[in-house]
Amino acid sequence: MSTIENMASEFSDVIKSKRIFAPEDAYMEHVEIILVGNGPYVLFDSGYSIQKDEVVDWIRKETNGTLEKFILTHQHYDHSGNVKSVCDNFSVPCHAHPIEIDLVKEREPEISFIPIEEKFVVNIGEINLKAIFTPGHSPGHLTFWWEEERILIGGDNILTDTTTAVTPPLGNLALYIKSLEKVLDMGPKLIFPGHGKPIQNPEERINHLLSHRNKREKQVLEVLLKNDSTLEEVAKHIYRNLREDQLRFGVNMIKSIIEKLKEEKKITYENGICKVL
């Protein structure tokens, strides 16, 4: 058994993760939904709607048909696709940040929500999980902190094997970096992410992600120091291996960097052209 599995297995009686595989056209291959508790139980996120029967069956099996609370880390469809199904099958409302509630209600206005914000405490038996506001990936993204054990239910703030997508208009790179630094300062020893296996080396992983973001910013500035460029030109230079059908995503990633650099008054972005000041 690996070190990661050993660390996660210490808490396997109170934290259970279920991998829900994505539809073929999805960007991510899978998403993790997480149950915390050993009676009562709280569910974090709900997976893709295409797998609603699998999700409901798993929750019913693990909780013996009871679920006390249901919480959404953020509104992206891979996490919120089964909100209505979970609410209906287990007679629970969904808790989420007010910003995320508004975004989900644009798609499904009939869902019952309870708004929660930073410092809200989720009580599950003897476990207390504090809501931590970590915007950037989504504007109302929340993570949940089990302080006594230094364990974080991380949503998409920090992922195991890939970088988190931060794309405008709802993604904000400056806020995302601040959220990474905020979690780093908390000193977690284990993170259960929204995609991938538990992260048993959070400090190393977060520092790697911060370094990666800094490297990307420098690459963008290097491109613009040579030539004023469009977003697409910058994306093609930096993401050389992207297929044409993936380029739009690359352009959006570059746009998040451009918006941060513009806010910091390092560049201008006017009429579709990026230029170093």
Predicted regions and their residues:
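A short catalytic or substrate-binding loop motif that flags glycine-/basic-rich loops and adjacent residues
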Residues: A26-E29, I114-I116, P135-S138
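C-terminal regulatory/interaction regions
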Residues: V223-L277
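Short Pro/Gly-enriched beta-strand edge/turn motifs at strand-loop
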Residues: D13-F21, D102-V104, G125-I127
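Glycine-rich phosphate-binding loop signature in dinucleotide/nucleotide-binding domains
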Residues: E62-G65, V122-I127, E147-E148, D185-M186, ...
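Aromatic/hydrophobic pocket-lining residues that form the small-molecule binding cavity
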Residues: S80, Y176, L180, I254
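Active-site HxH/HxHxD metal-binding segment of metal-dependent hydrolases
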Residues: D25, Y48-G125
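Conserved beta-strand hairpin/beta-sheet module of binuclear metal-dependent hydrolase folds
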Residues: I4-T63, L142-T160
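Metallo-beta-lactamase
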Residues: Y41, Y48-I50, N128-Q219
